[in-house]
């Protein structure tokens, strides 16, 4: 993914499950950061109440790469998926107590609005700065149901060419180059 993003100069997504798997991306994220490569890291995560209780391979994923990102988007957990489990362990306080079922749609809409904004900001930052971003997605199990279309409208970005050109006086450079007794050429990323 890093090589593809480098070649096409557009964001490329990498996706992983939660826990230790996410940490395996750190070398690529650091390289993308210092090489100006727009990498989008999408990670699944456990619900907040499952973190720091010894649940297998569960780590604090929010902002784990912040020193090498231009944007970190910790999304909010859906409240309509597996509501009974959320209510049973309402440590993350996603649903207010006492709970009124008619509030659920309004609460979910607020989550959707927040998540859509975070996704948009992350993708915009990756494109604008040509650097990596991280979108962390908490999910409640079970994850058996599927959907036919996304519930968040993804933004459409216009293609802006940000190719940088460097110009120098070619005659002056050629003259200087030809007079030099020793020459060194350094090649690297700009």
At which residue positions do the language-model features occur?
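Short beta-strand segments
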Residues: 15-17, 38-45, 76, 134-138, ...
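Short acidic, glycine/serine/threonine-rich loops at helix termini
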Residues: 2, 25-27, 51-55, 84-88, ...
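Short coil/turn connectors at secondary-structure junctions
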Residues: 8-12, 34-39, 68-70, 129-132, ...
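Thiamine diphosphate
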Residues: 1-51, 154, 159, 166, ...
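Conformationally flexible catalytic loops at phosphate/diphosphate-handling active centers
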Residues: 90-109, 113-121, 125-180
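Glycine-rich, acidic loop regions that bind phosphate or pyrophosphate groups
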Residues: 32, 43-122
């Amino acid at each position: 993914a890093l090589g593809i993003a480098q070649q096409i100069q557009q964001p490329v997504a990498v996706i992983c499950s939660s826990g230790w798997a996410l940490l395996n991306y750190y070398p690529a994220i650091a390289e993308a950061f210092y090489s100006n490569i727009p990498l989008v890291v999408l990670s699944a995560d456990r619900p907040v109440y499952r973190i720091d209780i010894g649940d297998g391979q569960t780590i604090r994923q929010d902002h784990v790469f912040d020193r090498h990102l231009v944007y970190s988007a910790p999304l909010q957990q859906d409240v309509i998926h597996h509501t009974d489990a959320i209510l049973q362990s309402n440590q993350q306080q996603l649903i207010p107590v006492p709970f009124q079922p008619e509030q659920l749609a309004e609460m979910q809409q607020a989550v959707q609005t927040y998540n859509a904004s975070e996704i948009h900001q992350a993708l915009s930052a990756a494109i604008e700065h040509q650097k990596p971003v991280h979108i962390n997605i908490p999910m409640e199990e079970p994850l058996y149901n599927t959907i036919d279309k996304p519930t968040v409208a993804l933004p459409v970005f216009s293609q802006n060419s940000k190719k940088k050109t460097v110009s120098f006086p070619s005659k002056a450079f050629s003259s200087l180059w030809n007079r030099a007794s020793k020459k060194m050429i350094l090649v690297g990323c700009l």
